[in-house]
Amino acid sequence: MMIVIKTAIPDVLILEPKVFGDERGFFFESYNQQTFEELIGRKVTFVQDNHSKSKKNVLRGLHFQRGENAQGKLVRCAVGEVFDVAVDIRKESPTFGQWVGVNLSAENKRQLWIPEGFAHGFVTLSEYAEFLYKATNYYSPSSEGSILWNDEAIGIEWPFSQLPELSAKDAAAPLLDQALLTE
């Protein structure tokens, strides 16, 4: 069983599982195809699962894939805590350029559904975090795109006071208006 929590962008959903716990530990169903499709209102096929580990203050993103290789992602944090962000990059969307952010952690067990047409990123809040995501399309290097994490046109309110640790690629990412020129 999952509880759906709507966000400021209607297509991006927080999924909170029913957790059964006692002195031995806990159990929850992290994914059920039928339940998931009922919750989001359409059929989805996940073709790739990814797992990353990041230390505190590492920021990954904002990443997306273009065109027919666009990816929907169902993400969660299995160890530690992250602040996870989705940015609407669908040019015809009424929420284009808007973002939503949510804390995902091993403790709250929440997941975030990010449909195709969004850029995605996260920053690690705990000493380290292990992050899991299911993707609806295969990774395609020729279709990948990125947006600079601190683009003022988007205005993400990241929850940190010092500059994050970035890959060279993420640090050199273009602003939103430049990133979408090749669409």
From Swiss-Prot:
It is an enzyme of class 5 (isomerase). The keyword Transmembrane helix does not apply. GO terms for biological process: dTDP-rhamnose biosynthetic process; lipopolysaccharide biosynthetic process; O antigen biosynthetic process; polysaccharide biosynthetic process. Substrate binds at residues 24, 29, 48-50, 60, 73, 120, 144, 169. Pathway: Carbohydrate biosynthesis; dTDP-L-rhamnose biosynthesis; Bacterial outer membrane biogenesis; LPS O-antigen biosynthesis. It catalyses: dTDP-4-dehydro-6-deoxy-alpha-D-glucose = dTDP-4-dehydro-beta-L-rhamnose. Keywords: Carbohydrate metabolism, Isomerase, Lipopolysaccharide biosynthesis. CDD domains: cupin_RmlC. The active site is at 63 (proton acceptor), 133 (proton donor). Changing residue 63 to A: Loss of epimerase activity. Its EC number is 5.1.3.13. Pfam families: dTDP_sugar_isom. GO terms for molecular function: dTDP-4-dehydrorhamnose 3,5-epimerase activity. SUPFAM superfamilies: RmlC-like cupins (SSF51182). Belongs to the dTDP-4-dehydrorhamnose 3,5-epimerase family. Catalyzes the epimerization of the C3' and C5'positions of dTDP-6-deoxy-D-xylo-4-hexulose, forming dTDP-6-deoxy-L-lyxo-4-hexulose. This is dTDP-4-dehydrorhamnose 3,5-epimerase. It comes from Salmonella typhimurium (strain LT2 / SGSC1412 / ATCC 700720).
